[in-house]
């Protein structure tokens, strides 16, 4: 379960539409590093992410990506297997949108609380 509490320069950001959850694999880790400049945590303008080029951009891993609606700054993923994941959250404060990314780990079916 998670919530958006991101602010920059005194402006609070709200989530836009859905939150993506991508499994951490060697391919997705390299892709995330290229797109966001980190595999741990990032806040990058959406236009910058879209402008970056990734190797093998046509690789089809979409069947493994999960998506949930973000409502009132909150989101939740249930039934995740143990492992590493990348949360991808588009946010806006009325200006140019940003994309937040954070790495999370799930273990033993326990809930993980994440604040971005």
PLM feature segments, named:
Residues 1-116:
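Long luminal/extracellular ectodomains of secretory-pathway precursor proteins
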């Amino acid at each position: 379960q998670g919530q958006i509490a991101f602010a920059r320069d005194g402006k609070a950001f709200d989530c836009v539409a859905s939150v993506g959850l991508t499994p951490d694999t060697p391919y997705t880790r390299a892709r995330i590093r290229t797109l966001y400049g980190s595999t741990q945590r990032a806040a990058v303008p959406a236009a910058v992410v879209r402008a970056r080029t990734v190797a093998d951009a046509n690789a089809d891993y979409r069947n493994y990506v999960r998506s949930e609606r973000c409502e009132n700054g909150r989101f939740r993923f249930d039934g995740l297997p143990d492992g590493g994941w990348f949360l991808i959250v588009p946010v806006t404060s009325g200006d140019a949108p940003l994309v937040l990314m954070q790495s999370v780990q799930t273990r033993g079916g326990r809930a993980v609380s994440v604040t971005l």
